[in-house]
Amino acid sequence: MSIRNSLLRTYFARRMKAIDRFRRHPDQVQAEMFRQLIARGADTEFGRRHGVAKHLTPEAFAARVGVQDYESFKPYIERMLAGEKNVAAPGWVTLFARSSGTTSDRSKFIPVTRESVWWNHTLGMRDVAAVYASAKPQTKIFDGKTLTLGGSYVRENGALIGDLSAVLILSLIHI
C-alpha cells in the first residue's frame, strides 16, 4: 500500500464516522443544517423581505417563503450579477452557473456561493471517496492520475459565469 493510500485511509476513516452519523440520525442532521442555513440567510435582503428569522421552523419557513420560480427570483440574481452583496446570500456571490436554457429558451443564471461549493461539492466528493475506500480497502485508485474536463466560462464584473462543470472545476479545492 502506498503512503498516499495510508494517509487517505486514515483521513477517510475519520470522515466515515461523520457519514455514519448522517446515516444513523438523518432527521437531526437535517434539522441542524436547516438552522444553519436559516441563520445565514436571515440577514440577507431576501431573508428580511420574507420574514426569515434565525429561530424559524421549517413549517413557518414554507409558509413565509414558499416555492419560488426563476422569474420571481430573477431580480435578486440580476442584482447579485451586478456585484451587490447580501442580496439572497451572505456576502458577494461571485460564481454563477449558466443553464442551457431549457424552459424559456434562454440561459438562466444560478448563483453558486463558495460556501455551497465547499459543503456540497468538495465535501461531497470527499465523502464519495471515503465510502468507496471503506468498501474497497485495497483500492489503488488514489495512486493514479485523473483527467477532469469542464465547460466554458467567462469573467464579467468580477464574477465567474459558465457551465456548472467549469464553475466547480475552477473553484474546487482538490482532494
Regions found by a protein language model. Name each.
Residues 1-98, 104-173:
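Nucleotide 5′-phosphate-binding alpha/beta core
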